[in-house]
Amino acid sequence: SGKHISTEVSFYNMDYFTKALVLFLLGFIVSCLGWLAPQSKAPKKLTWILSLSGVGMLIAGVTIRCLIQGRPPVTTLYETILFITGCCVLTAQALEYYDRRNIALTVSTFLGALGCFLSNRYELKEAVTAGDTMPSLVAVLDTNFWLSTHVTTVTLGYAAGLLAAAISHVWIFSKMLGVKKSDPSYYKSLTRMVCGTLCVGLFFSVVGTILGGIWANYSWGRFWGWDPKENGALMICLAELIILHLRM
């Protein structure tokens, strides 16, 4: 419709995701500088402003895409990267709100910048190969119910798993570089964040995988077929289960 066309033109003119990328990059740089001056509160406040502004631009862009297309933002790899990036940043910000060590906040800006950069590369690829970054859905995927339940749920699980992996790498590199050797609470805090995020990721991954099987059964008459996507979902669930059981 004419309304959707004008909205889409405005969406491309605003370039939300490039602006989000710039904000996240600035936030990451400021946060890194803040680690060099831990007594100063100004870098952390500025990082919060940049991180919140970045995720605000990201959410605005994703929301407008949803309104234009009339479906959840998880139907292509490009959209999925943006959705996962937003979920990672919001979850990291929530962790920082409770932890207040500047670890999760730094991770939020790093993952935000990385996700927006990767999405930009896939946007260019879709524009060249498909001729459109908002392509029509294939018939089997054209159902808002399963896109809103299975795909969104399992993607939330993957986002939590990605965030847990990022925080785990902070733990590893901190140990390698001897960061805060005399502060065991630093590593305990990282461990708590990883375990908590993994629990959330495992819940959504398991529920999303089961919902995917139900959708597959409705669509082509079988719950599980051992195809690459199903195997990948199962491996993520098993990996998170192993980590949590070893922690116990």
Segments (PLM) and residue ranges:
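Soluble non-transmembrane domains of integral membrane proteins
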Residues: 1-11
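Hydrophobic cores of alpha-helical transmembrane segments in multi-pass integral membrane proteins
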Residues: 1, 16-71, 75-134, 143-177, ...
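Helix-loop-helix junctions that connect adjacent transmembrane helices in secondary transporters/permeases
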Residues: 181-188
